[in-house]
Every structure is written in structure tokens, then in C-alpha cells.
Amino acid sequence: MEKNFALVDLHLHLDGSLSLDSVKELAALQDIEIPDNDKELLEKLQVREGCRDLNEYLEKFDFPCSLMQTPVGINTAVRNLEAELAAQGLIYAEIRFAPQLHLQKGMNQSEVVAAAVKGMGQSTLKSTLILCCMRGKDNHEANLETIRVAKEFLGKGVGAVDLAGAEALFPTADFEDLFVLAKELGIPYTIHAGEADGPESVYKALEFGAKRIGHGVRSLEDGALIQRLAAEGITLELCPTSNLNTSMFESYEVYPLRKLMEAAVKVTVNTDNMTVSNTTVAEELKHLALSKEEMHLMAKNAVEASFTDAETKEWLKEEVEKRFL
């Protein structure tokens, strides 16, 4: 990785990206007992080799979530993550999390987001929050509340909403009303689709009006869908190591990034969960053996698709070009 090259991460989950140091600080701040050796601690945070699927992968989120149930826990986690991303050379990141998963100690969703916003902007990193609705069967009201809270903070730290969780168990088709509301309120959105479920999930996300798709790699199972993604300029938020972790692909060599590029689909390279998958954006780009020109294209695509304001987007575009020269 060339020094000072512009790095961007559009698909980064807060709860899956708490570093070991951050976890220790959060535990100490809140008097929470955690394993006293790093090996045991990492076992609670990182996915094991031989992970079966996305559902097993998602089990790694309960422990870090338990450390972010207070205002100080959340704003410290965001502050630390932004500092770590800046140190890695990122110029911009979109950090996503589900406010409804942080209510165990009395906060409401608005208070959760306010705490996260308080942790932003304390490093050189430019950032935006994406609030995740969660796939499930008993949380419809909580999801609607997430949309309403996103509107409350839109342009004040929050840039968009998302739908995350166990895609194969809770199909995208079941969540249309969330995006009807988001559209009515003028909130941009991305949708996790085409990861654990097939092309039909991506078709539904497009039907709901999504201009960005989280993962989306199973779109390759449907040639007509690939043509549509290219024609409509839909951006895919690819997360290679995460997809290898969940047994979607056997190796980076067969990961379909270039196949998608050859089909004129806009793609970006992201981490998904830095700690769960033990990765960084720089490592993702290295694994894929991208040329300097290809890395430049990934950064340009990411900035163009970002959920930030026009002024920040222009600054990011200039920074990407300046660092490419």
C-alpha cells in the first residue's frame, strides 16, 4: 500500500470493529469484567476459522454490544474507532450500528445516537453514521423508531439508514414499509442484500429504491440483475474477507470483484467488521492484489456513493485525486 493513498470504508459496523485496546478501555470505564488475557478476549471478538455461515458469524456481536449500553460506552467506542481509522490512513468512513441494540441500560434510541454523534469529529477522519434497522420478527416498532431517529439526526452526524441482520432467515421483502417511510422522510438508504440470500433479495432492495447494496455478491447468479445494476449505476459495498469468513468464497483469488468490474458494476472495497474479520481496508486491497489505478477507482467510487454532504464530498474528491498523483 502506497503511503498516503486515500482510503475509504463505506461498510463498517461499529460493534464488529472494536479493537482490543478499545474493548479494554470500555470495560474499565464501566467496571465490566472481561477475560484478563488477550487470547480469550479475541475469542469473544473474532470469528474462528471454519465458520459455517453468516448466522454463526453474527454471534460475535453480542459481547461488544454489551460494552456499548451507556452514553460513555458508545461515544468512547466511536471516538476510538475514528482515531484508529485515521491512523490507518482513512480519509472517510461510514460507521453503522443499530441503535435498538443499545437499550439494555435505559437509553432510548435518540439518546444512543446522540452519544455516538458526541464521539465523532475528534480526529482527522471525516465520517458519517448509518443507522441500521434489524431483520427480525418482534422489532417492527423499534425499526420504525430507528427511521424516525435518523430523520432527527439527518445532516447532524447521521447520513442514512440500512437493514442488517440474518438475511436468509428474514427476507428483504418483509421490510418494505421501512423504506417507504425513509423515502417519505427524505432519508437516504443502503440495504444488506445478496449476501446470505440470493438475487431476489437484491431485486427487492432495488424495488425499494436502494442506490447502494451492502455486499450484493450473489447478484452474479442472475445475468439480468448484473446488467440492471450496471445500467442504474448501483454501488455494491463489497466486503471480501467477511464473505470468505462466512464460506461464500474459498479464496481471494476467486473473489468476484474483477468480474463485477468487467460487467461495469460500480464496486467499493470495505471491511464490514475490522475486528470480527481481523482486517483493515488496506489489507482488503492488498488481498485482492489491486493495481494503483484500481485502488484509485475504488476510492473514487466510494466517495461518489457516499452519504455525506456536498461540501465534504467535493473535499474528498479533491483529496482522492491529490493523493493519487
Residue ranges of predicted features:
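Conserved hydrophobic beta-strand within the GNAT/NAT acetyltransferase core sheet
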Residues: 189-191
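Metal-cofactor-binding active-site regions of metalloenzymes
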Residues: 1-187, 196-201, 207, 211-212, ...
